[in-house]
Amino acid sequence: MLTASALIEQGLTTPTSVYDVPATLTIDGQTFKDAFEHGAQRRTFSGIIHDSMNTGTVLVGQKLSKEERYNWLKKYGVGEFTGIELTGEEQGIIADWRDWDGRQQYTVLFGQGVAQTPLQTAMIFQALGNKGVRLKPRIVDAIIDADGTEHKRAVEPGERMVSEETAASCLTLMENVVEQGHAR
């Protein structure tokens, strides 16, 4: 979804944009295929996401430069501490885009080639679910004194990742995957 949101936000694709997706895709000597066998197909971007097609994701995702891919990963918090109020949080791993090899520059488009924590992953989806705004994770919503007085903690302002329109498009893409695609 990170790649989809970046592409849609930058105006490089829409859910209804149509692509000719090959059975296998070879770019820069790197060959990509999908988890299921298929011939060449005409697919909308929504259809590519619907069936989690690595070939289609790389085909469309290469519209983003390597640096743009890296910047979107970092913007969403991959390889960064989330700021949650717990000790022992891991940062995750993302190599600088200038150090990506011939394969990693493409696998990052479909979620491989980086190491992110489950919380970092949840934060990506949380931002899309919050109309494009990523909120800082927190454990404590309120503190209740011994006398029963509740002290609500203020919610910190979030950071805009994508527009409300892009977030809504991504939510629709995800709903389609769950209702009709490979996540059912």
Question: Where are these predicted regions, by residue range?
Answer:
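Beta-lactam-recognizing serine transpeptidase/beta-lactamase-like catalytic domain environment
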Residues: 2-184
